[in-house]
């Protein structure tokens, strides 16, 4: 989220290391794991993919109104507008283990009603990981959230990354 909010300064970023063989690796932040016949995308791969598919064209201000100092509650956010699709895209990450209530307000916009499309990456179950035998244990899931009076009132579960899209 910080990288996205500073897109006027940071023009490119890369993720390393990218690949790891399941029988010969040095550390575990790799994006793609493989053996001689198969490959599997890591949870980190899906985080990068979700950002890449929801870049938008303009960064817009986004703040979280919380009773604790910025970042101490484990919630992080960024927002963009995509002039090609007419969508506002808000990304929220909850790094804690507990669910947290989030109210996303779209101040200054025309009336938004209906539903926001969502994409959620749920990493709350520490026993799960994408493996060659279970490559889809943790993958992004599409959903929706109600928008009432230009506000999305929702709960973001612990260890979740959620993208909200409204027109």
Question: Could you describe each region identified by the protein language model?
Answer:
Residues 83-84, 157:
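Short, ordered coil/turn segments that flank beta-strands lining enzyme active or ligand-binding pockets
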Residues 86-95:
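Short, well-ordered beta-strand segments enriched in hydrophobic/aromatic residues
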Residues 67-70, 94-167:
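C-terminal beta-sandwich/jelly-roll accessory domains of carbohydrate-active enzymes
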Residues 1-78, 84-85:
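Aromatic/acidic polysaccharide-binding cleft in carbohydrate-active enzymes
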